[in-house]
Amino acid sequence: MTKLAIHGGNPIRVKPFPAYITVGKEEKKAVCEVIDSGCLSKYLGIWHEQFNGGEQVQALEKEWSEYFGVKHAIAVNSCTSGIYCAVGATGIEPNEEVIVSPYTMSASATAPLVYNAIPVFADIEENYYCLDPEDVERKITSKTRAIIIVDIFGQPYDVHAINSIAKKYN
């Protein structure tokens, strides 16, 4: 293996990732409509017609589920909440394993812990810093229940390789 850049080796990336605007006019308009309504959140913590949020949230979930052809979609406030929901939705049991990246926000590793499962770190690949499919496959055991995949810096993971591995091992 060559010397890491931090130890004097050649860096993989010499040009910084580009900065870009992530909020467009449509998003600004939608946010202003919610703010102008005078009610930022219609989520209620009791069973009620608005239990799952206001009109905008319910419209988003409906549109999302129709677009992807799925029965349900749940909007959450952050990727952290989404990861926690996704791990819980697997029906994971205590002591089962979840393969996670060592190079991501801590929620990827803590979400399995919430369900008394075990996070198992797989290595990242050197160009995009996402999970290395070969190491993911090496880490799979009879206790593996899920793989948490995250994109880093807007760079996607190797979708085809990871999905093939996930299907292979169910």
Predicted regions and their residues:
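Conserved PLP-binding active-site segment in aminotransferase class I/II-type PLP enzymes
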Residues: 1-80, 85-88, 149
